[in-house]
Structure formats: C-alpha cells, structure tokens
A protein has these predicted regions:
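Long, intrinsically disordered, low-complexity accessory segments associated with secretion
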Residues: 1-187
Length: 187
C-alpha cells in the first residue's frame, strides 16, 4: 500500500516497493485497501418536470474519517468496491471520486440500480401536478433519494426537505413494494 507524506499543502503517496514505469506510460497501484468501510447504500434520481421512466443510480455514501474505516486524504481517482459472497470476493461496482479531505462526505456512484425503477407522469387534466412512483422488485428494502430542482419551483406535497439546492424526497421502498409521491410545481 502507498504511504502518505506531506510537502506543504501537497500530499505525496510513496510506494513502498521499487516500481519501473516506462516512458510515456503509467502504472496503477493500490492506494488503500480497507477490509471494512462503513457506507450507506442508497439509490438516487435527479428529475425535472416531465415524464420519467427508468432506473436509478446506486451510490455508496460515507464520511472520510477513521470511525468509518477511512481517515486519510483521498486523491481523485477510480474506486472499486467488493463484497464477500459464499466465501468469494465479487465486484459490486466501480466509480470515481474527487479529492476528499479528512472528515468530508464521500459519495461514489457505482452504477445503475437493477430491480428499482422510477416513473413520473403528469396528472391528467393538470399542467403543474405530477405523480412519481418508485417500485422495488428486490427482496430487500431500498433507501431512495429523489432530487427535484429547487431553482424556479415551489413544491408542495410529500415530505420534502431542502438540501444543497434541491428538494429531496427520501423514502424506504419495501421489498417487492412501491412508494408514491404526488406534488405540484409553481413556476
């Protein structure tokens, strides 16, 4: 594993073994191998007005701190996530992260969710009301976040909260179940 050093405000990662890199080439080495990092596994969808029918993105969310199994400055780059199934390590997904300092929130999009879909349709006879349905065909409850743009909207309905410029609907969708939200926009 690489060892972190600091030179002023620049972080260096020294590789503890000799490595040869040919001219105009690159070499990948593991920066970090953590057997257990505490993460929240959730699904997210960002939508605007109009019809939507499709899958959601699967994210892993954590804080970059020792209590969660991290706690070092993380440089931008690729991330691979694995899980143990029947005694074997299997790839769950791959994503990218930006630079993250210690204590910062880390979100990694690791792919498209299977078995969970969102469908939004305008309510017949209206121009400002929408029905949003999230269905879960999986055998486990899934935590879903739907983000609706806040800028020119006035949203009414459901349990919506403001977060980072978005209206957020966060819901647990039961196994083989669905959750619905009806909301209105005012432009």
């Amino acid at each position: 594993m690489a060892e972190q050093e600091q030179l002023g405000d620049v972080r260096l990662y020294r590789i503890p073994i000799e490595v040869t890199v040919a001219a105009r080439s690159q070499k990948q080495v593991a920066l970090l191998r953590q057997p257990a990092v505490r993460v929240e596994n959730l699904l997210r969808l960002r939508i605007g007005p109009g019809d939507v029918d499709g899958p959601l993105q699967r994210l892993l969310v954590t804080r970059n701190r020792p209590a969660e199994g991290l706690g070092l400055a993380l440089p931008a780059g690729k991330v691979a996530t694995f899980a143990m199934r029947d005694g074997r390590r299997i790839l769950i997904g791959e994503g990218r992260i930006d630079d993250h300092t210690i204590g910062e929130k880390v979100e990694i999009t690791i792919g498209t969710a299977t078995g969970v879909r969102a469908r939004q349709r305008s309510v017949p006879g209206t121009t400002d009301a929408y029905d949003l349905t999230v269905t879960n065909d999986l055998a486990e409850t899934q935590t879903v976040e739907v983000e609706l743009p806040l800028d020119s909207w006035s949203l009414k309905g459901g349990k919506l909260v403001k977060r980072e410029g978005w209206m957020l609907w966060r819901v647990n969708v039961p196994a083989n179940g669905r959750r619905e939200l009806r909301y209105r926009i005012k432009m």
